[in-house]
Design a protein with these regions (language model features):
Chain B
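Hydrophobic beta-strand positions that form the internal "hydrophobic ladder"
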Residues: 138, 182, 223-227, 267-271, ...
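Amphipathic beta-strand/beta-sheet edge segments enriched in Tyr/Trp
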Residues: 76-122
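A structural "domain/chain start" motif
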Residues: 23-62
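A flexible loop/linker signature enriched in serine peptidases of the S9 family
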Residues: 131, 142-149, 167-168, 185-194, ...
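Multi-bladed beta-propeller domains
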Residues: 154-169, 198-215, 241-259, 285-302, ...
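Bacterial N-terminal signal peptides
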Residues: 10-18
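Residue-level detector of Asp-centered blade-edge/turn motifs that repeat once per structural unit
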Residues: 132-134, 177-178, 221-222, 265-266, ...
């Protein structure tokens, strides 16, 4: 009697397991997924990551020992974009060579710096839209540096000159043809005067 | 009789929950070089999908397509994925050719979208033996006109959120391997500087703030070091430092502009774009310092923005030849480059076969995914503005 009951239960148990796991192919593996927490990347909604906290300009770079080299003497100066706007130098495609036709502009910038010994210079390097982004950022810097070298050759102390590249992020012309592109491949000179 | 039933049952149960122990027909998720198959010529894995609807079905299709699957009817497919998303996602996968069930799972919690991604990942792993990418993340730049910000999102572009609010120019986000942290460039302090940001706290610190250009941070595969492009010595060169920017070492010293360093997965080499004799080339330099070697990219010109594949075998990069093309080349330099698809700035997924990249469309960039072996592409869900410079979290 007992064994019949046992057999019955066993068969029933097996049948149920069989039905659950086998014939009807119902899934039995349940995977619970973690709920999003604050601080989890891309949780399930917008506010689960805090935005980058603000950085105060002039804050010392961590770790100790690394200085913000070379830029302290350019702080507290007033920028004058207009003074040398006419001397913007243009470059050939994919090149940082200062063309001979552009040299008179470089000379004019050198004169302006020689006649005002307290002034410093910021050179912005720019590219047209056709390059890739990081390549253009490096090329824009190379253009600004080439102009600094040209000024150094004319006797200007390179420590008076700071460079900054904007890659293709700051075009002057938004067109998509050579007439726009050639204007965007440029080095701009921004005269810096000490605050009175 | 009891014993026979038990045996039959255990066989059935075992086969239902068996995993990829039985050889799947197409386990290979790697890119073959010389078999004539691969590099865009591999046929997809054919799968039939049924029972899923709406967003869950879209998610599963998207996730599988960009990992080399394609869809057909149940009579033609090797694999059948059936299931439902009525309240929660559940699915059963079987192999029609080998007549066996491969998995049966139900998912709860998070969102329906996330459950569908989890199922897609389990399907990919069951069939190919490699981990799926459906639950991975990307970082990228969103340009909204004059300014840009760094964003992170699911790999398919959903759940995007800004991690900077600098109202200036940002560039070149790079995930720190295994960490919820990014390097990126920001002009927030009036100069292109490299920052490290802990995404779980929002805390950030400057890593390179030298005069001139500080950009293109690339963390080493173990996260202990970072390569970057600095122009502090008079020309944009490749430098390497500890992860916090200390112990700086200059690796290249050319008058040309180096750009876009990337590491080999063994951490020994750094590949980058430069110029030799007026020609734009890819080179690699030992991360510990030493002579640079050229990586030939025969068949294409003007390479830039390299990214080394997770298995070490390939370098994906942009070739600029009138248009921009995503290409790959054997990292050992022993084969020609292959053009894959129009686009720029590729970043490898951790699966070593899917790439994310940017392509130009109507005057702005959109992000797109490419499965290299099958050449199947899908655009990522658009955020806003122009989305570019993607970096895949590994």
């Amino acid at each position: 009697m007992k064994s019949t009951k046992l057999t019955y239960l066993l068969v029933l148990g097996l049948a149920l397991t069989f039905a659950a796991a086998g014939c009807k192919r119902k899934p039995v593996n349940v995977t619970p997924l973690p709920e999003p927490r604050a601080g989890t990347v891309g949780g399930e909604g917008p506010s689960t990551l805090p935005p980058g906290e603000s950085i105060k300009p002039g804050e010392e770079v961590k770790p100790g020992g690394l200085a913000t080299t070379g830029l302290e003497e350019f702080e507290n100066m007033v920028a004058d974009r207009a003074a040398l706007a006419a001397q913007t130098v243009h470059f050939d495609y994919d090149s940082s060579v200062v063309k001979s036709g552009e040299k008179p502009k470089v000379e004019a910038v050198a004169s302006a710096l020689k006649s005002d010994s307290a002034a410093k210079l910021l050179i912005e390097g720019h590219c047209d839209e056709r390059g890739t982004e990081e390549y253009n950022r490096a090329l824009g810097e190379r253009r600004a540096l080439a102009l600094r070298e040209a000024l150094a050759k004319l006797g200007i102390d390179p420590n008076r000159i700071r460079t900054i590249s904007y890659g293709k992020d700051r075009p002057v012309e938004n067109g998509h043809d050579e007439s726009a592109w050639k204007l965007n491949r440029r080095g701009e000179f921004i005269l810096l005067h000490p605050k009175a | 009789m009891k014993n026979t039933t038990c045996l039959k049952l255990s066989i059935i149960v075992a086969s239902l929950f068996g995993f990829a122990s039985a050889t799947p027909a197409q386990r290979d998720a790697q890119i073959e070089v010389n078999t004539g198959v691969g590099l865009g010529n591999t046929p997809p894995i054919w799968l039939s999908l049924s029972g899923f609807t709406d967003e869950a079905a879209e998610v599963i299709r998207f996730d599988l397509y960009v990992q080399g699957f394609n869809f057909t009817n149940a009579e033609a497919a090797q694999y059948l994925l059936t299931g439902s998303n009525n309240g929660n996602v559940q699915g059963q996968l079987s192999d029609r050719f080998n007549k066996k069930a491969m998995l049966g799972k139900s998912y709860t919690g998070a969102s329906l979208r996330r459950q569908a991604h989890a199922l897609a990942d389990d399907v990919v792993e069951a069939i190919t033996g490699t981990k799926g990418i459906a639950q991975t993340k990307i970082a990228f730049k969103v340009n909204t006109g004059a300014n840009s910000e760094i964003y992170v999102a699911d790999f398919d572009g959903h759940n995007a959120q800004a991690v900077t609010h600098d109202n200036t120019i940002v560039a070149a986000p790079a995930w720190v391997p295994g960490k919820l942290a990014l390097y990126y460039t920001s002009y927030r302090l009036g100069n292109p500087d490299i920052f490290y940001q802990d995404l779980s706290t929002g805390q950030r610190r400057a890593v390179a703030q030298y005069s001139g250009l500080n950009t293109s941070a690339a963390p080493s595969p173990d996260g202990s070091k970072v390569a970057m492009i600095l122009s502090k010595s008079g020309s944009p060169d490749v430098y390497v430092a500890e992860a916090d920017g200390s112990n700086l070492k200059q690796l290249t010293k050319t008058p040309e502009d180096e750009s876009s360093p990337c590491w080999s997965p063994d951490g020994k080499w750094i590949c980058y774009a430069t110029r030799i004799n007026e020609r734009r080339v890819l080179c690699k330099v030992p991360a510990a310092g030493g002579a640079a070697l050229r990586i030939p990219t025969s068949g294409v010109s003007n390479p830039s923005e390299p990214d080394w594949s997770p298995d070490g075998k390939w370098i994906a990069f942009t070739a600029q030849m009138g248009d921009f093309e995503i290409c790959i080349v054997p990292a050992q330099g022993n084969g020609p480059a292959t053009v894959l698809v129009s686009g720029e700035d590729p970043s490898w997924a951790p699966n070593g076969r899917t790439l994310i990249y940017a392509r130009r469309q109507s005057g702005r960039y959109v992000l797109s995914l490419l499965d290299v072996p099958t050449k199947q592409v899908k655009d990522v869900f658009r955020i806003s503005g122009s989305d570019s410079q993607p970096s895949w979290a590994k």
